Design a protein with these regions (language model features):
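Serine-dependent acyl-ester chemistry module
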Residues: 90
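Short gly/ser/thr-rich secondary-structure transition/capping motifs
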Residues: 1-6
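N-terminal small/polar loop signature for handling phosphorylated ligands or for N-terminal nucleophile
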Residues: 52-77, 83, 87, 101-105
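Alpha-helical macromolecular-interaction surfaces
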Residues: 33, 37-40, 62, 70, ...
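Glycine-rich phosphate/diphosphate-binding loop of Rossmann-like nucleotide-binding domains
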Residues: 10-54
Length: 113
């Protein structure tokens, strides 16, 4: 069971906190819903959100780093990569994951993705 043992979810309290949502532009039909959901969650927590758009998921770490170094107290990175018949999916996902993890470790700013 994948949900077994999961913690109960409650809206965190982040009154006045600045959160940057970094979102890729590819697959806008899907991304629109993801961005709207992220903004809703940030708002419910009492934080202030801004949105920065990346060309694609590969570029998310660069913009996440800029947001973290620019004063964001947390970064939410959103991207959609659809698996096809080539290894492109693996390359992009690995680079984005490694890069976003590196941003969090290097800056001390939480990066959710």
């Amino acid at each position: 069971m994948s949900g077994s043992g999961a913690p109960e979810q409650s809206a965190p309290h982040a009154l006045g906190m600045r959160v940057t949502v970094v979102a890729a532009q590819w697959h806008e039909r899907i991304m629109g819903g993801l961005v709207a959901g992220a903004l809703r969650a940030v708002e419910e927590a009492g934080a202030q959100a801004s949105v920065v758009r990346a060309v694609g998921s590969f570029e998310l770490p660069v913009l996440a780093a800029a947001a973290a170094r620019g004063g964001a107290k947390a970064v939410v990175a959103l991207g959609v990569v659809i698996r096809g018949g080539t290894p492109h999916f693996d390359y992009v996902c690995r680079a984005a994951t490694d890069g976003l993890s590196r941003v969090a470790l290097d800056t001390g700013v939480p990066v959710g993705f």
